[in-house]
């Protein structure tokens, strides 16, 4: 059962509890917003990280986008950018490299 199905069935999942706690909102209110499509809690099944909710009644999220280009390929610089984003409190990070060994760069950034 996915999160939307759980919400529509009135099931408060661990993700809903965690986001409600982080956001300082009532879990039942968040459940209702998810069930009606007013909030989402995105999740990458391949990465274990904290949950972040997006939508009505939740705080604005900060996303950091980093990545190499075909002109500048410096994996260490991307790692430094990722660390700076984390230190600055970014909620999410998008690694958008288009130049160099993409798998190696992403692996390095995620390590």
Question: Can you describe what each PLM-predicted range is?
Answer:
Residues 3-52:
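An N-cap/entry alpha-helix motif that binds or orients negatively charged groups
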Residues 8, 16-20, 58-79, 96:
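Active-site mouth loops of central-metabolism enzymes
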Residues 30-38, 79-96:
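Catalytic domains of carbohydrate-active enzymes, especially glycoside hydrolases
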Residues 34-43, 50-64, 103-111:
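Alpha-helix-loop-beta-strand connector modules within alpha/beta enzyme cores
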Residues 45-46, 67, 97-101:
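Short, ordered loop/turn segments at secondary-structure junctions
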Residues 49-50, 73-81, 100-109:
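N-terminal active-site wall of soluble small-molecule enzyme domains
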């Amino acid at each position: 059962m996915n999160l939307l199905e759980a919400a529509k069935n009135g099931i408060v999942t661990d993700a809903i509890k965690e986001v409600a706690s982080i956001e300082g909102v009532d879990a039942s209110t968040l459940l209702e917003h998810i069930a009606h499509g007013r909030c989402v809690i995105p999740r990458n099944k391949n990465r274990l990280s904290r949950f972040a909710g997006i939508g009505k009644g939740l705080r604005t999220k900060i996303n950091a986008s980093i990545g190499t280009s075909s002109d500048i390929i410096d994996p260490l610089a991307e790692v430094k950018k990722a660390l700076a984003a984390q230190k600055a409190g970014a909620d999410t990070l998008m690694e958008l490299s288009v130049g160099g060994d993409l798998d190696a760069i992403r692996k390095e950034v995620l390590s």
